[in-house]
Amino acid sequence: MRQFQSFSTTVERELAAAPTARPARTAAGYDEPENFLEVEVRDPRTHFPHGDSNRGMYTDYLVVCRTNLPSFPQRVSQVRRRYSDFEFFKRCLFKELSLSAHPRVVIPALPGKILWARRFHDEVIEERREGLAQWLSTVAGHPLLQSGSKVLVRFLQDEVFNG
């Protein structure tokens, strides 16, 4: 009788056995897209600035950006952002858009605030991370923002976001 193997185990073995060389480019081509911008929100961390005290606690998230867009100085970047940074980013986007020739870009609502008592529970933090990831993917996926928003570039690539 054959031993049961999960799909992921089988795939992992196949990938390990596969050659690591990149396949030759074909005329039909599945090359890297001409222009791309990928963003991820992951690795939430809760910080305790005052030791064991709950005073001043906050959670931040790792924002990873991969792109080949000419308006982005770095091809790959990682920055940490708090929820309040996302709120500030949204306000800065509104201001930038109101001063530009494209004020009709719709910026979706951020995921809602969390009840104070539950904001550091793991499942609540994960739910917020998922919401922020979806929100940022939507915003960063807008073609007008990809090509013309200096605020988007700074939010995704500057170590400290100042708007």
Swiss-Prot record:
It is found in: Cytoplasm; Golgi apparatus membrane; Prevacuolar compartment membrane. One of its GO terms (biological process) is endocytic recycling. A 1,2-diacyl-sn-glycero-3-phospho-(1D-myo-inositol-3-phosphate) binds at residues 82, 84, 113, 119, 128. InterPro entries: PX_dom, PX_dom_sf, Sorting_Nexin. One of its GO terms (cellular component) is early endosome membrane. Keywords: Cytoplasm, Golgi apparatus, Lipid-binding, Membrane, Protein transport, Transport. Pfam families: PX (PF00787). The keyword Cytoplasm applies. Its main location: cytoplasm. Required for retention of late Golgi membrane proteins. Component of the retrieval machinery that functions by direct interaction with the cytosolic tails of certain TGN membrane proteins during the sorting/budding process at the prevacuolar compartment. Binds phosphatidylinositol 3-phosphate (PtdIns(P3)). This is Sorting nexin-3. It comes from Eremothecium gossypii (strain ATCC 10895 / CBS 109.51 / FGSC 9923 / NRRL Y-1056) (Yeast).
